[in-house]
């Protein structure tokens, strides 16, 4: 098998993985999204909350897999993709799986993720968001013969600056000195109840 060292090949592999995971875990019912590869220093991936792409007369979601973390083991990349697919499933079926503007993953997300091949752990701030592949998913990945994607975009210090010094992007080896906490703003914003 050829090494995945081109972005076009990486995107193609992720699209193929989406189709196989969709068939296996969702009976092929999820609409195929646009798969993008962009740096997201604070996350392994994300999905848009609405269908933001128009392609071939169809509106589509976007699932982004962070280009900075593509070179993780394939089971971790597949787990991230499946995590985002669970969000898509929840949006498509009307299940409210997050709160706090999509940041906090609630128990409904946990239930859906566990029903679709993921193991879920709790994070104090973000809820049931820490996902890893279940044994069944690992077996599925091995059966599919998926190979690691052998490329990843390195994060520069400027990429990290916007996320707060001291934060560490998943998969990166960069760290920084902690920033002092921001002082609370005394500015109040008034919104007219009739507008």
Regions found by a protein language model. Give the residues of each.
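Active-site recognition of the HExxH zinc-binding catalytic motif
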Residues: 79-92
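Metalloprotease/metallohydrolase-associated module, dominated by Zn2+-dependent proteases
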Residues: 2-63, 67-71, 92-195
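An amphipathic alpha-helix signature
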Residues: 78-79, 110
């Amino acid at each position: 098998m050829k090494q995945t060292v081109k972005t076009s090949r990486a995107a193609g592999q992720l699209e193929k993985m989406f189709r196989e995971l969709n068939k296996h875990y969702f009976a092929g019912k999820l609409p195929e999204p646009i798969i993008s590869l962009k740096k997201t220093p604070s996350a392994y991936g994300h999905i848009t909350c609405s269908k933001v792409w128009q392609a071939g007369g169809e509106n589509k979601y976007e699932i982004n897999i962070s280009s900075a973390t593509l070179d993780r083991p394939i089971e971790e990349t597949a787990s991230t993709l499946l995590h985002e697919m669970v969000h898509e499933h929840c949006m498509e079926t009307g299940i409210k799986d997050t709160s706090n503007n999509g940041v906090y993953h609630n128990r409904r997300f946990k239930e859906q993720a566990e029903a679709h091949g993921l193991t879920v752990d709790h994070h104090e701030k973000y809820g049931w968001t820490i996902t890893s592949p279940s044994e069944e998913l690992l077996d599925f990945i091995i059966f599919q013969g998926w190979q690691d994607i052998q490329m990843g975009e390195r994060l520069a210090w400027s990429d990290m600056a916007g996320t707060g010094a001291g934060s560490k992007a998943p998969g990166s080896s960069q760290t920084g000195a902690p920033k002092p906490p921001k002082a609370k703003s005394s500015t109040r914003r008034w919104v007219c109840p009739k507008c």
